[in-house]
């Protein structure tokens, strides 16, 4: 039995996907993809599924997401799901299709929050007093 593990990251959200042979079930945090709310998040998570088409009929994917907010979790899960589909099937034309549609389906977003500097640490990394000319 073939098993594939992949990881997707977005800011502080980390998604771990496990793809196995099965009947096409996709679960995010043990919840079926069809029951995800709000609709925007469900539609964004459906993108790699729609692009893959009938290939997913023989793959089960379980995604566990921790950390971050709802949109960051959605982006991390989407990346992990896309990577799992490509790694499990091994089809290069599908990989090229994902990359041409949206690069973030396979490549995690490298941007992170900037650390706060010591001057006004609670106000943010670049907080300064407002300058008055008069």
UniProtKB/Swiss-Prot annotation:
Keyword presence, Ribonucleoprotein: yes
GO molecular function: RNA binding; structural constituent of ribosome
Region annotation Disordered: where it falls in the sequence: 109-134
Record keywords, A-Z: Ribonucleoprotein, Ribosomal protein
A GO BP entry: translation
UniProt-listed HAMAP family: Ribosomal_uS9_A
Protein name as it appears in the record: Small ribosomal subunit protein uS9
The organism's taxonomic lineage, starting at the top: Archaea, Methanobacteriati, Methanobacteriota, Methanomada group, Methanococci
């Amino acid at each position: 039995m073939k098993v594939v593990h992949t990881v997707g990251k977005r800011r502080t959200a980390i998604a771990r996907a496990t793809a196995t042979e099965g009947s096409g079930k996709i679960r995010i945090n043990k919840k079926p993809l069809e029951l995800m709310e709000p609709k925007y998040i469900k539609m964004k998570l459906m993108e790699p599924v729609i692009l893959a088409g009938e290939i997913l009929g023989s793959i089960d994917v379980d995604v566990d997401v921790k950390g971050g907010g709802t949109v960051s979790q959605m982006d991390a899960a989407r990346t992990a799901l896309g990577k799992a589909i490509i790694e499990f099937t091994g089809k290069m034309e599908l990989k090229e299709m994902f990359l041409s549609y949206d690069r973030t389906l396979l490549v995690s977003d490298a941007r992170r929050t900037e650390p706060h500097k010591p001057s006004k640490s609670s106000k943010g990394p670049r907080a300064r007093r407002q300058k008055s000319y008069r």
